[in-house]
Amino acid sequence: MVLFSLVATHADIDLETVAQLSTGASELATSALSGSPAVKGAVVLATCNRFEIYGEAPHPDDVEAARAALVAQISERTGLNEQLVSRSFNTRTGGEVSQHLFAVSSGLDSAVVGEREIAGQVRRALINAQHEGTASSGLVRLFQAASKTAKDVGAQTALGSRGLSIVSVALDLATDLSENPDWSAKKAVVFGTGAYAGATMSLLRERGCTDISVFSSSGRAEGFVATRGGKALDSDTLPAAVAAADVMIGCSGSDTRVEAEELARVRAGSAQTLIAIDLALTHDFDPAVGELDGVELLTLESVRLAAPQEQAESLAQASGIVTGAAAAFEQEREARSVDSAIVALRRHTMNVLDAEMEKVRARHGCTAAAEEVEFALRRMVKQLLHVPTVRARELASNGQQEQYIAALDALYGITVEQPAAAPAAECPVDHGRAGQAPADVRRETA
């Protein structure tokens, strides 16, 4: 089995393309596994500025077929040309897969370097895949190791010690744009009830903002504010809240967004400036709202450009931890695969021995002589297996365990089987999309 990943991020392509690629992401892994024998496991990591697919294929020769199957699935779901989809992804295999994911989980590859939110997103991606039954055992170990690496980076370095995140940088920008930087006097409207909305609520309160309203077309706003505070909005109260707001923050990423024309109508006659912070990859707010009088629009690109740089020492320490963890993961993975091969060879050899001993007993009975023959044969088999076992570990230490596995298949017809799917997660995950929102403003996903 071989791990691979398809990676599309803010570092290589524009966020609009990343958003388009992520359309239908929640069903991609399931359809890929059912549609291609080359895909034995898949975990999808979709965030505000990246869309990545981590997969497991039976053999290195199957990676290209697995990639083609995933590209075709994405093209079908998004309506994008297959060639465009293919060009948008960088393909990683072998040690590059763990090196990249560990860096991502640790915040080293984020628009805001060192941010901690991505670690939670990596954990949730695995939980989702386990719930859907698409996480192979190899992928489970990969993502668990990534989460552990992120914890080690947080505990052993100063990376992220300032608590920066995409949300915090966005709110800092909003403070700079405000005529009055005092958040205790501001009214905020938050669109969405997911993880970003929760982080936004917490950071707003840290800054002193107490007048926070939350809108969810799915009816989840009441439950959301019940545990976090704030006021739940519905389709009737949303327009008035937006009209009076100093800040509105989009955290949902639905198919429908706040249109400039509707916002202009709702805000007509307002003398105060509205800061619109769009943290959704697929845009909660029409980009044209930034052209309206009295509206300042902040986007993910604004955050990326404004994000402060981490200190070089912290980055070097974190990078060292990531590199070491990735190397250890690859060594453990190689040892695990060759262990399965050794067990398979021993099982095959002992099955042959047992079959021959059955013939001996059938002819001579369970005599002392038969026992002596069995003892001698088992000792001989043990000696014969010694060199192949040593060679297996030598090859694994050099990353050549696949050659050993291929040799077993070629010489003895032994197929080294490894589990393809991990058990489902214990906690359920809601993958549903929200319903329709009021025509006044928008629809959102909780």
Curated annotation (Swiss-Prot):
Annotated GO biological process: protoporphyrinogen IX biosynthetic process from glutamate
Keyword annotations from UniProtKB, A to Z: NADP, Oxidoreductase, Porphyrin biosynthesis
A Pfam family that the UniProt record links to this protein: GlutR_N
Pathway given in the UniProt record: Porphyrin-containing compound metabolism; protoporphyrin-IX biosynthesis; 5-aminolevulinate from L-glutamyl-tRNA(Glu): step 1/2
Gene3D superfamilies with a match to the protein in the record: Glutamyl-tRNA reductase, N-terminal domain, NAD(P)-binding Rossmann-like Domain
Residues the record marks as site: Important for activity: H100
Residues that hold NADP(+) according to the record: G192, T193, G194, A195, Y196, A197
GO terms of molecular function: glutamyl-tRNA reductase activity; NADP binding
Xref: SUPFAM superfamilies: Glutamyl tRNA-reductase catalytic, N-terminal domain (SSF69742), Glutamyl tRNA-reductase dimerization domain (SSF69075), NAD(P)-binding Rossmann-fold domains (SSF51735)
Protein purpose: Catalyzes the NADPH-dependent reduction of glutamyl-tRNA(Glu) to glutamate 1-semialdehyde (GSA).
Xref: NCBIfam families: hemA, PRK00045.3-4
Sequence similarity: Belongs to the glutamyl-tRNA reductase family.
Subunit structure: Homodimer.
Name of the protein this chain belongs to: Glutamyl-tRNA reductase
Lineage: Bacteria, Bacillati, Actinomycetota, Actinomycetes, Micrococcales
